[in-house]
Amino acid sequence: GLRVSELCALNIESLQPNSTARVIGKGNKERVVPYGVPATRALMRYLIVRPMLAKKPTRALFLGVRGGRLDPRSMRDIVYRVAAQAGVPEISPHDLRHSAATHLLEGGSDLRTVQEILGHNSLATTQRYTHVSAERLRQTFTQAHPRA
């Protein structure tokens, strides 16, 4: 659920031992964002090879081909390329952020928690993600209710 700029700004020390990351978001506000087991495993594998990517010492977590901090444009290009290779065209990093929020809401998370994870100032901004959940509720009701 991170913004591309937040992901690119992560430093190694941003990762916490309890599978959370300390993220500096919009307005220089810090928040703690959890991540799951698959991300933890991927990060562990990445951290093993990361020293080979660094051309000089850097605190940056994600590195580009020249060994410096990966920039948001390069991150977007990577997402577009990997999505196309996977046969999922027209997907952006923001689509992934939107999907993460939607999955949290559909999984039963409350709106306030999702707001905190996404780093939104306003609950109204987070509410934009609820329309998909409402649609899913309607579909489930129609399919499951005997008199719908």
Residue ranges and their predicted role:
Residues 3-48, 59, 124:
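Conserved tyrosine-mediated DNA breakage-rejoining catalytic core shared by Y-recombinases
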